[in-house]
Amino acid sequence: MATTKSFLILFFMILATTSSTCAKLEEMVTVLSIDGGGIKGIIPAIILEFLEGQLQEVDNNKDARLADYFDVIGGTSTGGLLTAMITTPNENNRPFAAAKDIVPFYFEHGPHIFNYSGSIIGPMYDGKYLLQVLQEKLGETRVHQALTEVAISSFDIKTNKPVIFTKSNLAKSPELDAKMYDICYSTAAAPIYFPPHYFITHTSNGDIYEFNLVDGGVATVGDPALLSLSVATRLAQEDPAFSSIKSLDYKQMLLLSLGTGTNSEFDKTYTAQEAAKWGPLRWMLAIQQMTNAASSYMTDYYISTVFQARHSQNNYLRVQENALTGTTTEMDDASEANMELLVQVGETLLKKPVSKDSPETYEEALKRFAKLLSDRKKLRASKASY
């Protein structure tokens, strides 16, 4: 109930800031949002690989990267990991990972990350390998070094408040300039599955600032699209690049939201008689699955409604598989067979229609998005050269 209430408040706050002004393409704020979902992150990884390939083709540039085209990239849990991979710079100040590198990352490291710890009193996985590989891949990079604005969520169990890591917050809250590997582990530290993460940074006065963090899904319930939009709203109002924008209109937003799949067109259904026999652990696992599916649907519903109300429905694309079955519904099944199935889910999803009322496939819609992103980037570069 509290989460739904928070969504509604944010939804109406965003709606209240809109106007009827039509923005020029170069003034549009581009937003990429990636859901949480553990090993199911393979599904949005397939979508990202396709989109980045389209951008490279449209711009005839094999070095084009997603971070070159999006003003804000937000993610929760495994989506936060993907966000870091495509925005963290390498030694040449380019993203250390191309989109095509993400699926191989899951295949190489997934089985070690989701390797049952054998503990009956602690979390299912000890998290040591996950933290180790994040340290190796992301190094000492901090939030301020991200190649575009990021929005990665976590939840502090000591202060009982969400923590949002963004570049634009650093001037007011320098303690949020944490190392990317600490942030990535924290946003992925799902209760039951991984231990919470403790680390420190420093305030502007040099005082120690403590974090006690768990999965960002506790704060955003799996789908960070509303969070990403709120960060984009602030960016549009504060960044000089958008100085002509007086108030936010959804005609000025281009939002791509990627899901990790649900089984809400239910493969798994339960009866009251069946659930009455469950113990606490079974309920916790079921509630997490149900909440993620329901919140994903409601967030999509809220955002779709506001875009349609502003006659900007073509500016929002939600890419989601709503009929996962069998092992593909599990966030921690990192067997090679299941990961291959998840790849197939992502590839098949590209061929599916965006909606029952539209013949346009996700593949076609992403090509349209790629063209818009490319044109906008060129227009902005041209404007900046004058």
Curated annotation (Swiss-Prot):
It comes from the Eukaryota. Gene3D superfamilies: Cytosolic phospholipase A2 catalytic domain. Pfam families: Patatin (PF01734). GO terms for biological process: lipid catabolic process. InterPro entries: Acyl_Trfase/lysoPLipase, PNPLA_dom. Residues 321-381 form a coiled coil. It is an enzyme of class 3 (hydrolase). A motif (GXSXG) lies at residues 75-79. One of its GO terms (molecular function) is monoacylglycerol lipase activity. A motif (DGA/G) lies at residues 215-217. The active site is at S77 (nucleophile), D215 (proton acceptor). GO terms for cellular component: vacuole. Residues 32-229 form the PNPLA domain. Its EC number is 3.1.1.-. A motif (GXGXXG) lies at residues 36-41. It is found in: Vacuole. The nitrogen atoms of the two glycine residues in the GGXR motif define the oxyanion hole, and stabilize the oxyanion that forms during the nucleophilic attack by the catalytic serine during substrate cleavage. Belongs to the patatin family. Patatin have a dual role as a somatic storage protein and as an enzyme involved in host resistance. This is Patatin-14.
